[in-house]
Amino acid sequence: MTDPTPASTPPEEYPNADYRQLDRSKLSEMMQRYLEVKEQYPHALLFFRVGDFFECFFQDAVTIAHELELMQTTKAAGKEVGRVPMTGVPHEHVYRYSSTLLEKGYAVVICDQVEDAAVAAKEKRQVKREVTRVLTPGTLTDDNMLKGRQNNYLAALVIAGEHWGLAYADISTGEFLITQSVNLEQLTQELMRLQPSEVLFPVNAPDISKMLKPGETDNELPDCLPRCFCYSLRSQKPFSLGEARPRVLQQFQLKSLEGIGCEHLPLSVRAAGGLLEYLEDTQKENTTSLQRPRTYTLSDYLILDHQSRRNLEITTTVRDNTLYGSLLWALDKTNTPMGSRALRRWLLQPLLDLKGIRARHDTIQEFVNNHQLRQDFQQLLRQIYDLERLTGRVGNNTANAKDLVSLADSLAKLPQLAALAEQAKSPYLKALQNLPQSLEKIAEKIHNSLVESPPIHLKEGGLIRSGVDANLDEMRSLATDDQQWIANLEVQERERTGIPTLKVGYNKAFGYYISISRGKAELAPDDYLRKQTLTNEERYIAV
């Protein structure tokens, strides 16, 4: 990644921005930990949790302040070091800011606090911090970072002479496809069709894990690769057949690759293995739930070069390169994001198989002829959320309670779709009758387990209904009893001391305390030990 500092800005305006020029031993303990993490991800921007903020230091602070138009300040980094550049964002907004950086082609690392800061403070040491997320343009699953009606593809390539293998996946939906062919011009056109958010490419260079933003170049990239994409340069090792083949077999619990039709496609297997290794490297504790790779052949589809797609205005117009006015804009009357993404794929990759084309036409004709059936389908589909991405987040362990409710609501509608399909003649629609009955049971279980309006964030608690789990009910009862005990204590102490405004509170520093306003402090009994003095109150503990 190139140095994003504006060329017109004199380097002396950013003293200590380059941490490589500093004596590490003289840095504060926190700054030393920051640099330990930074050196593991030298080509990413590092957000480092400090209290209620995520802070960035050194050159990252300069870059982030410039790209996000944030205020840049400084922070003490050690007595003999002085101050270094610093930029910070509130912890609750870190993903919103990260999304903007990802759109600009950066990778972002989130290093969060993994223990209670009060515990570390009590033991007089630094709070433990670990990398919890590595965000790159091709590995996003959060809805607010994705375009609902467009796939977010991560692609991986292996090139050997004129032959090439390609694997690409949308980890937000689980789609995973591979292909292999000859002719580098076809590779260029396939990439232009897919418009991947990120492309992995193995190189023989010491500076691996480097990320090239759109428009940047590198001597390691062959001329056939369009420079309009974001490229992550990776080590050759995970792209070798010796590592890639067993990784693919293990990931999908296969005994051979014949079952997915790629035993004879070594370059595509290597690309798939490299992609899986990258997900292992970036997703940390979040598992990635991908479907088994689907092998396809370019000759099964009409190949449209980039110029033809542009002239035909399939997804964007020639005039201003926007969706409005394009063929996709005119045709996309779909009722779900899933349908919109599928329509985009169909337009960009037209079938050549006559049987498949007729099957699609027959389905459309049935909807045209049967107004009531069409209306019933539309009404039901409008009540179904983005099942592909909902199940993707569940599989990736990133779903929240709202996602689970949306998933259950959507699954509960599928039996009604299956019932509608009984009236249909088209094989496409008839296939809906084969929906597993277990889906309805899953929806019922979710609805019966969650409260009616669960909080969005899992850490808030209060998600599970009473009666679902006996141990949880017992713990909840104990917590409720504790709250009642505190309320009773407050009433008791008010009566004993004659202080009607006395309160019982809690903080992480010294636990439960008794609060008395400064004006009533002289009424505090002898068995109250003062622990803290504030502007308007005194805080005590009972001895």
Question: What kind of feature is each model-predicted range?
Answer:
Residues 323, 335, 356, 376-386, ...:
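Secondary-structure capping and boundary motifs in well-ordered enzyme cores
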Residues 1-372, 379, 389-392, 396, ...:
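Basic, polar low-complexity surface loops/patches
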Residues 239-246, 303, 318, 405, ...:
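Amphipathic heptad-repeat alpha-helical coiled-coil/stalk segments that mediate oligomerization
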Residues 309, 499, 511:
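Active-site lining segments that contact anionic ligands and/or coordinate catalytic metals
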Residues 394-395, 490-502:
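Acidic, serine/threonine- and proline-rich low-complexity regulatory regions
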